[in-house]
Design a protein with these regions (language model features):
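Conserved beta-strand signature within the Rossmann-like core of class I S-adenosyl-L-methionine
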Residues: 141-149
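Class I S-adenosyl-L-methionine
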Residues: 168-194
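A short SAM/SAH-binding and catalytic strip from SAM-dependent methyltransferases
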Residues: 114-127
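N-terminal, positively charged/glycine-rich alpha-helical extensions of SAM-dependent methyltransferases
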Residues: 1-22
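Class I SAM-dependent methyltransferase SAM/SAH-binding core
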Residues: 53-104
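A short glycine-rich, Lys/Arg-flanked "PGG" loop and its adjoining helix->strand segment in the class I
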Residues: 129-140
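A short acidic, Gly/Pro-enriched loop at the edge of an enzyme's catalytic core
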Residues: 103-115
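Conserved SAM-binding loop and adjacent beta-strand
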Residues: 25-40
Length: 194
């Protein structure tokens, strides 16, 4: 299924996620996907504030992980797949779910204290050009925890470094590459904190 997703073009990606929504969580449980829990724990260590944006929330795995880590504030989930959002709504952990892309978030400037995103900045999905939008809604002093695949990290980090040079973002931590998706031995990811 992952190859089916990664091989799709931008116009068919949302539709493929809509079709996958009913088995997405089961599939990822079978594959041992640890990204949501690792990112949630990382965000809680760095301070979540009271309003968190789950950018590319999918079926709500990150929201569930955040709540299980003790996050009690407002949780906003954004995703471009209506099927995924319907599944996320059934999780009962989000205060607000929004159908939108990360490139054009319908949120006010500086409206969230933290951003979390797992499995989104990857092949055929979202590139580093979306970082400026996350910075916009987070504002000064916000925290962002994002999983970044090592095979595309250099390309993504160019956009992050541009924001850093402009004084809009500051790299806080980048974990060593790890297997967050054990079923895909070749895929290593880091948790990056800004």
């Amino acid at each position: 299924r992952l190859d089916w997703i990664f091989d799709s073009d931008a116009s068919s990606l949302a539709e493929r996620y809509d079709r996958w929504a009913s088995t997405y969580d089961t599939d990822h449980d079978e594959w041992g996907w640890r990204g949501p829990h690792a990112a949630a724990e990382c965000l809680m260590l760095h301070g979540s504030g009271s309003v968190v944006l789950d950018a590319g929330c999918g079926t709500g795995q990150v929201g569930v992980a955040l709540r299980s880590c003790g996050f009690e504030g407002d949780l906003i989930g954004v995703d471009f797949s209506s099927g995924m959002l319907a599944t996320a709504a059934r999780q009962g952990v989000y205060d607000q779910l929004v159908h939108a892309t990360i490139l054009d978030l319908p949120l006010a400037e500086s409206s969230v204290d933290a951003v979390i995103s797992t499995g989104v900045f990857t092949h055929g999905h979202v590139g580093g050009e979306a970082f400026s939008e996350l910075v916009r809604v987070g504002g000064h002093g916000s925290v962002a925890v994002i999983t970044v695949r090592q095979d595309i990290a250099d390309d993504l980090m160019v956009d992050a470094e541009t924001l850093e040079a402009a004084g809009r973002w500051q790299l806080v931590e980048r974990s060593k590459p790890q297997q967050l998706h054990p079923s895909r031995d070749e895929v290593l990811q880091s948790l990056v904190v800004w």
